[in-house]
Amino acid sequence: VLVEISRPDDAVLRKRLDDGKFHDCRDDENAVAVPGLLVYRLYAPLIFANARHVMMRLRSLVDEASPPVKWLIIDAQAIHDMDLTAAQRFAELHREFADEGIDVKIADAPRPFREELAKVGLSEEIGSQDFFVSVKKAADAFEHKYGASGSSAV
């Protein structure tokens, strides 16, 4: 049980070609990664026991991405609970990513998740423009800004 809590299941979501939605897809499914966009889903609460592991995992995914990540979308739908320690760690990582020019967006965030972000002052830093009702809406905003290839549309 301790291992399950400290190293929870997660996924990098990919865009399915048949419906354009982002899913946790097997390698043999008809889905693609969008260049410059990393969509991450955690299948657990974000708490003291797993915060370090999850933040290291996110750091690793961003560092290994090619091309480099421009936007990191956190699919927060399964993060039904987050404690203060985890919120603080998330805030630290968010600031690191911001310093590196990586925009962090939050999709489908439950109320408890948003409340913990507010407690550590992160909801003001992220801003309402960085919260989306779904991963699809967030990814659409990314593609509107950068195009489907991830290069600047401006």
Which residue ranges define each predicted feature?
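Structured cytosolic domains appended to multi-pass membrane proteins
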Residues: 13-154
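Flexible hinge motifs at transmembrane-helix junctions and intramembrane kinks/re-entrant loops
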Residues: 1-11
